[in-house]
């Protein structure tokens, strides 16, 4: 199962306080603890995910790195991300070592071959790229399988052996007064295996940090919020485990002319005062050329004209949307004396027609007059 966002795993917002994060972890840890769900392997995996999320979000430095870079910003060798299971440290901090004895799970073996973390990459596209589709080159800082040891973590010619301290159990029991407490094995860190001669390149982790360059095919019609999954392109697993996935999250830049609403595109078209009065033709842009828009006489500001099929074809199939052009009548500026005189003559002529020439303006003025009459003004 693909790893969730750590905040989603704990069910808290990104601005959650340390106290809220701790409370969420306590609640979920009690709910999914393996010893309370012995016949439910999914609960154990869920518990590991909850613990891993808490390990990162409860540490200010790790949380800051995660907020900036996602899973790629967390160093798995420090306990956050990378599918390392759980170590039990923060668990003891919250519930106390007695909790491990009560449930018998305070140092459960993690095993080698842990799946790598999923990664998130935010890709910003132009509207043209999003509508037509494109191929993007991205650089992703991540963990890759160590080529020197092939992911085993052991030096060439050697292999991991059963841990001599815990005998492969991943945990040891310690006596604390009247209580017998189970803790993570300090030798193998819960894996149950010990590397006596670690790889000189990855120092026993089975993977190394590297920046990968990937080519991502973006299908036509994507929009902000869409997500593309690249299977196996996440972080390499620990100890030869399978890699995680890479999720490319799409964001579309603001366009200087068009705005998008689903499959439809919108634009604002300024028209001159004479064109609004008398009508005319106007060239308007589309994403694949231009079309001629016929403006009828007596067009008012805000009128919407629809150009069918000039919108966006949805990424999941279907017919293309439309281009909707909203006209805005532009008031003439920087008039000379002759033009001002002509406008005044036109105004006098129009006033003679009363509400016939300006029905909206006269209707509004009549409404205002009635409003004032009701107020006695």
Swiss-Prot record:
SMART domains: DnaJ. A zinc finger (CR-type) spans 133-211. It is found in: Cytoplasm. GO terms for biological process: chaperone cofactor-dependent protein refolding; DNA replication; protein refolding; response to heat. The keyword Protein biosynthesis does not apply. Keywords: Chaperone, Cytoplasm, DNA replication, Metal-binding, Repeat, Stress response, Zinc, Zinc-finger. Binds 2 Zn(2+) ions per monomer. Zn(2+) 1 binds at residues 146, 149, 199, 202. The J domain is necessary and sufficient to stimulate DnaK ATPase activity. Zinc center 1 plays an important role in the autonomous, DnaK-independent chaperone activity of DnaJ. Zinc center 2 is essential for interaction with DnaK and for DnaJ activity. Participates actively in the response to hyperosmotic and heat shock by preventing the aggregation of stress-denatured proteins and by disaggregating proteins, also in an autonomous, DnaK-independent fashion. Unfolded proteins bind initially to DnaJ; upon interaction with the DnaJ-bound protein, DnaK hydrolyzes its bound ATP, resulting in the formation of a stable complex. GrpE releases ADP from DnaK; ATP binding to DnaK triggers the release of the substrate protein, thus completing the reaction cycle. This is Chaperone protein DnaJ.
């Amino acid at each position: 199962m693909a790893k969730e966002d750590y905040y989603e795993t704990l069910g808290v917002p990104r601005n959650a306080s340390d106290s809220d994060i701790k409370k969420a972890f306590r609640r979920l840890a009690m709910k999914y603890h393996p010893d309370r769900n012995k016949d439910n392997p999914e609960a154990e995996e869920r518990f590991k995910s909850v613990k891993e999320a808490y390990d990162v979000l409860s540490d200010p430095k790790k949380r800051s790195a995660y907020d900036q870079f996602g899973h790629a910003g967390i160093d798995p060798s420090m306990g956050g991300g990378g599918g390392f299971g759980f170590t039990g440290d923060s668990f003891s901090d919250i519930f106390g070592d007695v909790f491990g004895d009560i449930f018998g799970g305070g140092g459960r073996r993690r095993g080698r071959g842990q799946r790598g973390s999923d990664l998130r990459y935010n890709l910003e596209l132009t509207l043209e790229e999003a509508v037509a589709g494109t191929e993007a080159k991205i650089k992703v800082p991540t963990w890759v399988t160590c080529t020197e040891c092939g992911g085993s973590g052991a030096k060439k010619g050697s292999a991991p052996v059963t841990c001599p301290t815990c005998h492969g159990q991943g945990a040891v029991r310690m006596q604390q007064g009247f209580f017998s407490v189970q803790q993570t094995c300090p030798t193998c860190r819960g894996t149950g295996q010990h590397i006596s001669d670690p790889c000189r390149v990855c120092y026993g982790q089975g993977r190394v940090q590297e920046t990968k360059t990937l080519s991502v095919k973006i299908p036509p019609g994507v929009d902000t919020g869409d997500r593309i999954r690249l299977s196996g392109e996440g972080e390499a697993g620990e100890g030869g485990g399978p890699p995680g996935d890479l999720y490319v999250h799409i964001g579309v830049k603001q366009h200087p002319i068009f705005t998008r609403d689903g499959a439809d595109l919108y634009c604002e078209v300024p028209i001159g005062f004479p064109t609004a009065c008398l009508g005319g033709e106007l060239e308007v842009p589309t994403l694949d050329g231009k079309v001629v828009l016929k403006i009828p006489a007596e067009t008012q500001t805000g009128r919407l004209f629809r150009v069918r099929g000039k919108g966006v074809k949805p990424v999941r199939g279907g017919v293309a949307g439309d281009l909707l052009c909203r006209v805005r009548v532009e008031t003439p500026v920087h008039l000379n004396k002759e033009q001002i005189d002509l406008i005044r003559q036109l105004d006098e002529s129009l006033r003679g027609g009363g509400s016939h020439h300006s029905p909206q303006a006269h209707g509004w003025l009549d409404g205002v007059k009635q409003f004032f009459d009701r107020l006695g003004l």
